[in-house]
Amino acid sequence: MPRVVRFCAVLLLLACSGLSAESADQPRLRILVIGAHPDDPETCAGGLLALAAAAGHEVTSVYLTTGEAGIPGTAAPAAAATRRREAERACAILGVKTVFLGEIDGATVVDQARYRKMAEFLRDQKPDLVVTHWPIDTHADHRACWNLVYNAWVAENRRFALYYMEAMSGHQSQGFQPTDRLDIGAVLERKHEAAFAHVSQGITPATYDGEFLHGQMERFRGIEARCTYAEAFARQDQSPIVDLAALLKTGPRNVPGQ
């Protein structure tokens, strides 16, 4: 199928989706949020995850690593088991599925074997929309995650929409330039409950809004989007365009990026 025709077909599918759980006889979109560690998808895009699940789409939270290095003083196998349980609990709250890709926290490798593995995974999943880390980030695992996903997107001839999420902007994500803001007010409590499921990471109401910056980011992006709380996303150039608000039935159209 020529690229222009395929691109238009994707846009038509996205524009016509707007599904709810009650319209299960209509096609659903496959949406993947791919984070480097357990808690990345939930804190960076938990609102999108919750809204997409509530709209009836097939939504999966994908973890590149299992967070083995994320609990100081705890051996890697035990830490991984704890963080897997926390991620599964968080995703149950959001109503999404989980996939763990098995890379090692703090030692993620980018090589031809991993490129092939990610490309094969995405080819098998056949997603319509993928959200992953912004490429300019102080955390090496975040950068590796972006690299692997972006390479797979190119290898798959840019078949799916590719968007980026921010992680603790200014501390981890650097120079984030959003193209879309998504009103998450309707699912804010659910997003927070999912984030707080990551007990081992010390995510509490106080730290969520304080040292981890997530609450501050939600309010700031809300100001930009002319609502109270929002998440921001950046579309990769040459990616199919998704109107996230229309797709997820969250109300007015997103405010375009500056």
Residue ranges and their predicted role:
Residues 20-125, 154-155, 246-255:
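Active-site rim/loop-helix segments in enzyme catalytic domains that contact anionic ligands
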Residues 12:
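Metal-dependent phosphohydrolase cores
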Residues 6-9, 19-34, 109-258:
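Metal-dependent de-N-acetylase/amidase catalytic core
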Residues 1-3:
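N-terminal secretory signal peptides that target proteins for export/translocation
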